Amino acid sequence: MASKVITNSGVELSSAYLTKRRAALVIAVLFFALICAFIISLSLGSEHISLANILSGSLSREQEVIIFGLRLPRIILAIGSGAALAMAGAAFQALLRNPLADPYVLGVSSGAALGAIVGIMFASQFSLARPLLSFAGASAATFVVYLLGRRGDDPARLILAGVVISTLLGSLMVLLTTLADDLKLRNITFWLLGDLSSGSSEFIAFLFFAVAIGTVTLFANSRALNLMMTGERDAFALGVETNRVRWIVFITASLLTAAAVSTSGAIGYVGLVVPHLVRLASGTDNRLVIPASAFAGALLVLLADTTARTAIAPRELPTGAITALIGAPVLVYLLLGKWKGRQGETATGRRGEGEIISSALWNSRSVAGQALLHLNNISFGYSHQILAHINLEIKSGEVVALLGQNGAGKSTLLNLAAGKLLPNSGAVLWQGKNISEFSRREIAQQIALVAQAEELHFPLTALEYVLAGRFAQTAGIGFDSPLDIEIALQTLAATDSSQFANRSFDQLSSGEKQRVVLARALAQQPQILLLDEPTANLDLAHQFSLLELVRQLAHQHQLGILFVTHEINLAAEFADRVALLKHGKIIALGNPDEVMTADLLSNLFETKLSVNHHPTTGKPIITINTGNIN
């Protein structure tokens, strides 16, 4: 694209790299701090051992027993359990788009604790019974909370479900402990408050096996988690196999929680506090948040446990009580709505001019008039029929407008065209092949769906939001390349949004958000663009500029465009063809002059309309008459 389009692209690229360097610095500092805390913790306890002796290896036999037999296993448990809980919290928060979704609040820790108590009371003779039953309890709690809380995609409902399940499981734990003898009751009570003093080699092995598996699995899915933070609807449209990612992350986070709780007891709030502090320091990218959370969680629990065993030595404090003293105030802070996270800086470059995207960056893969997407006699419905025998073909280089009243099935038709829904009969064909044969990533490489912007629960800049559109076109878990950033900046400029690049998405107006959503779709570099009410919340000037951009994309870059609108005159002005949808059936399809007649439009909208023609362009101009059709 010509350099005049974005005068601040160098600034934005530098800002993106600065963010990565900042995050890398955070991880390096945490790693160094963890090493220092590890060494210092070895020296602290009821019997002090000098650091010089530890580092030089000049230890007495008694000191070797203390270091290697008592302190080192405990320190390893603290590091492993802290890393596990922090990563589980980061994963739950990203997946569920809820900053309060840590294993404790969600009831996952309670499920793990209940399973562990069952293991302590009834299967203590089996060394792995406690971790395995703990994992089963965590998984069951996660599954039930998800089923109860995810309906309607309401974060408050999810938290409420977690509180209910946690309370229920807590009651079951109380009932079980009444059956325990005095010795088991004492052990269970102290363990529930966080106990790292009794970990066996089997428990340590299980914990670090879980941490290793969890780290690799969560990091491998970290790019998908970035998209899940914008909402499952958007993530699915951008190429994420949301069902697969959801269950992988759920199972992994449950494994991490179970491993930590079964080996170290109920150490609370680590999964809540640590990810937030990490995001505050390094941003919201889960490729950085997950490893940084592991180091920070390990550091927090190690420091808490060191304090627990040294503050009133030789007596000990429960480690979980110390982490709760840190976590509870943070939870109150979040509930009061004070959390804002790291906000993007205001962009310094000038306002974009809305020019079309560079041909050098948008390599057209089709020729004008080529049939791209074919809705072949599709019907769809649930308890009642929504669409019936729809036949519609979208060709490269054309703009098709879909008109109809509310409830006619327009959005359902778009979701079928995007592969989000499967028809009850008929087929959606992409260049002659059934769309169901393609993966979500393959579909997102060809088809972009633009819906209304969803509310975000984590601070993302507009540039970060648009970069999510590059998911389908890039492989692996690497960071955004200079080309990805350049394409994102160009799509922001094309939608007249470059001045928003470093602003928080949630700080934008509804119309500004809608333009950024379109920029994200363009960053997918699709061949088909499906737009659901693209001009909603836009002022008149931006309605025209956006649809002019859409027309240019079709005519200059051979995209196929299908857009839903209630703006009849905008459809007449910008569409090459118009489809009229009434009660789930297409009643007319053709160029605007053929379709946009007074009779057809009046029948469609059940309102008397008049059609005139522009004296220069000859395009239809629709006005409303008084009175309704009887």
Where are these regions (language model features)?
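Conserved ABC ATPase signature
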Residues: 478, 504-508, 512
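Conserved catalytic motifs of ABC-family nucleotide-binding domains
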Residues: 525
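Alpha-helical transmembrane segments in inner-membrane proteins
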Residues: 2-344
